[in-house]
Amino acid sequence: GVDIAKSINAHGAHVGMDDIPYNQARKILGRKSIIGVSASNKNEFIKVKKLKGVDYIGVSAFSSNTKKEMKNYFGLSGLKNCANATKIPLIAIGGINISDVNSILKLKIHGVAMISSLLKGNIKKNCMDVSKIISSYEKI
């Protein structure tokens, strides 16, 4: 990911805990690049928020569809705790339904990353609905 981002002059990259370390990604891409880092649980979040210069944290998963994953999701209360613990912009990821977006953004979460709920049913309508919700939070 980071090598590809560099080779195509992308604005940045996102790295997970199993990817290239953040500090190495920053050296490769430079200070002006946008670099986000994933946090899949509370301990990872604590580590990531201490990294100097992280542009955003991808907090996942918001919710879960399986019992196996239930113990690892953040939910609204977990996202609220994360938002209160850092000034780094947060992006909620994983298991987000359109009906969740407003509640998530009310917590001062900076954005949502969604796939499945957008692709169910009328894709265009779903995207427009989410866009409308997000637009209501943008600063004028």
Where are these regions (language model features)?
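Conserved beta-strand edge residues that scaffold enzyme active sites
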Residues: 1-4, 19, 42, 63, ...
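Alpha-helical segments flanking ligand/cofactor-binding loops in enzyme cores
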Residues: 3-6, 23-26, 46, 80, ...
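Alpha-helix-loop-beta-strand connector modules within alpha/beta enzyme cores
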Residues: 17-19, 24-41, 71-98, 130-140
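Acidic (Asp/Glu)-rich catalytic clusters
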Residues: 27, 49-53, 105-108
